[in-house]
Amino acid sequence: MYKRQLRWQAAVFGFSAHTLDVRQNSEVVTRVLENIWSINGTFHEIGSEGWLQQVKSELIEPNLPILDKSELNDESFEILSRLELIFKIQNGPDPDAVGPFILSMTRSAADIFSVLLLARYAGFGSEKLSLKVVPLFETIEDLDKAPDILRQVYDFPIAARSLKDADGFMEIMLGYSDSNKDGGFLCSSWTLDKAQRAIARSLSENGVKPKFFHGRGGSVSRGGAPTDLAIAAQPKGTLNGTLRLTAQGEVVTSKYANVGTAATQLELLSSSVLHHSGLTNVSAVDPEAEDVMEALSSLSQLSYLNLVNHDDFVSYFNEASPVDELSLIHISEPTRLLA
């Protein structure tokens, strides 16, 4: 009996017990590529059409220039070494030990192409790269641009081959905290809803289904909500029998602190996803209701920005809230996040 359980555990979990995702900011990726190109020769202005075309032309180049890592700065050396390690793990005895490369603050197709190009410099193949890049769209503006960004990605064959998995899915991560800070609660919630529907339509044009990774926190301001209600609120056609979400800070303790609560939470999560994925009578958003929500979203964002951009808001917030006292508590995340 013990051996049978051990075999089951090995079959389900492998030898690493869990998969570790890798996460990096798009600005760091851009700086690394800039450093490489400054060594190899000239390059165009960051963010320009010339920059995009240079990334794409190198990405399809069969033989890239040999890179001398000793000439790189510390940041670039670390990122390239990390990608080389990912490649080594993927080709080792337990390839599932490392997960996707999550690209935070994805703002353009060039950001996604740049990660793939760095992967090529790190030794990944030239026809189809095994590095699964997961774009993380976080701000209101980037969520609005996401469908067009993904269209550009799937118009480029090597990226299309690399980002679509064997089951026809592409993983996309959605940022709740930053979109909330960017536009307020109502604007953020509505923009995330619209973005999921638009991304699903964009991917379907290329025969791809979305696998959404929800970067939720515990509080309402960070997308926190009861698990079953949060899943029930997902737009039609966006679940597809699969869902990923983050569990941060106090959520880990409240939902996964012991075997009983963890089992209950996982049962609720899986049953809710299966139930709502199988619903066929979910109606589409009514156009009139969509117009109303669009107007409310715009008004709420304007009101929110008028508040947080007020000259006295920061001093008022510091006086009216226990933020300084909270900074003395050693919890999961810092009290203040610096840009």
PLM feature segments, named:
Residues 1-2, 329-339:
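Single conserved hydrophobic/aromatic residue that forms the stacking wall/gate
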Residues 3-11, 18, 113, 171-181, ...:
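Catalytic cores of glycan-processing enzymes that make or break glycosidic bonds
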Residues 3-92:
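Extended, charge-enriched "interface" segments that sit outside catalytic cores
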Residues 3-7, 19-24, 96-103, 163-166, ...:
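Short coil/turn segments at secondary-structure boundaries
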Residues 16, 55-69, 92-100, 129-134, ...:
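Glycine-rich, often proline-containing surface loops adjacent to acidic residues and nearby aromatics
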Residues 66-87, 91-94, 101-115, 126, ...:
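C-terminal amphipathic alpha-helical interaction region
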Residues 122-302:
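Catalytic or ion-translocation cores adjacent to nucleophile or general acid/base/metal-coordination motifs
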Residues 292-300, 307-327:
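Active-site phosphate/pyrophosphate-binding segments
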